Amino acid sequence: MAKAKFERTKPHVNIGTIGHVDHGKTTLTAAITKVLHDKFPDLNESRAFDQIDNAPEERQRGITINISHVEYQTDKRHYAHVDAPGHADYIKNMITGAAQMDGAILVVAATDGPMPQTREHVLLARQVGVPYILVALNKSDAVDDEELIELVEMEVRELLAAQDFDEEAPVVRVSALKALEGDPKWVKSVEELMEAVDASIPDPVRETDKPFLMPVEDVFTITGRGTVVTGRVERGVINVNEEVEIVGIRPETTKTTVTGVEMFRKLLDQGQAGDNVGLLLRGIKREDVERGQVVVKPGTTTPHTEFEGQVYILSKDEGGRHTPFFNNYRPQFYFRTTDVTGVVTLPEGTEMVMPGDNTDISVKLIQPVAMDEGLRFAIREGGRTVGAGRVTKIIK
């Protein structure tokens, strides 16, 4: 296989198909892989519909999600594409972040127009911070009436605008089924769709370009050298002799300097996103720092105790609660590396939340946690995961 050597030369982008069930998300995913395989045979494998539809189960933060990953390349980019076939799977994926998306293809059947799930998916995409959506008007071969298809296009644009997405986003008329059958007109439509994806979904900001952050997993003392904190660098880069702050869990933030970076017992000049490293910290005692805090570039992250979040609560079958919960529910919220107890306030008019529901909640934590909007967490009771969510708004 001539696959490996292309990997690093192109920008890598994560995308996914979203939209109402039966509008053809999975068929379109299969059509994209086939069309790109035929166009760039040395870069791509073709994937049949049933290979994608029989999505393997994944566990993310204790929640089982059926999700398919395929990869393919255009001449400009390398794509990782996720397709969550079921509606519930899609919702769970979006909230738990099993697959982050840099952009999404909203699939709308030209024969139906936007449906309730179409709206729900676009709303969720907005809430979880998907940066860009463009549209594939699928089954366009089945609509002869030009006015009808223009009406559907207008409706979809209004839907995007209502959630602050680009109203002028490309809307490409496709037929996934006809493209899979090799009909030249519709093969070309899928090629045009991918050209639009290349052109309209912005290049993602690489993790290494973001400000440095490392969650503390462990702390120990090296005699004669000082205190070392270990963890996996979440984002950014850390160089020896750079100043950092230790944030969260405790009321005050501590400033210090990184005097050494090691990985696999070797000293490095630098640690970067994805590395598991130990950081030697100047003038810090073993008891000054603990698991659950984060080491960050000064001034980039602040600790908070009150936030609003969007959560998915596991059903009984998924190993979740057997009973609903009410206002003032007090579980633990697992952020990055540690549990912090919090009190839940339900939205006005919501009396209780049932297992299997997704809902918005307000939370007041008993200790501050370093957080930004978009940070994901698990909800646990005595170490057992009962839900997952993400921070949508910081209150205090």
Swiss-Prot record:
Residue sites binding GTP per the record: 19-26, 83-87, 138-141
Region (G4), start-end ranges: 138-141
Annotated localization: Cytoplasm
What's an example of a GO molecular-function annotation for this chain?
GTP binding
* A Pfam family the protein falls into: GTP_EFTU
**Segment G1: which positions?**
19-26
Segments of this protein annotated with the region G3: 83-86
Q: Which parts of the sequence belong to the tr-type G domain?
A: 10-205
Return the annotated region ranges for G5: 175-177
Keywords recorded for this protein, A-Z: Cytoplasm, Elongation factor, GTP-binding, Hydrolase, Magnesium, Metal-binding, Nucleotide-binding, Protein biosynthesis
* Recorded catalytic activity of this chain's protein: GTP + H2O = GDP + phosphate + H(+)
Q: What is its EC number?
A: 3.6.5.3
Family membership noted in the UniProt record: Belongs to the TRAFAC class translation factor GTPase superfamily. Classic translation factor GTPase family. EF-Tu/EF-1A subfamily.
Q: Which NCBIfam families match?
A: EF-Tu, PRK00049.1, PRK12735.1, PRK12736.1, small_GTP
Write the protein's name: Elongation factor Tu
Q: Which organism is it from?
A: Mycolicibacterium smegmatis (strain ATCC 700084 / mc(2)155) (Mycobacterium smegmatis)
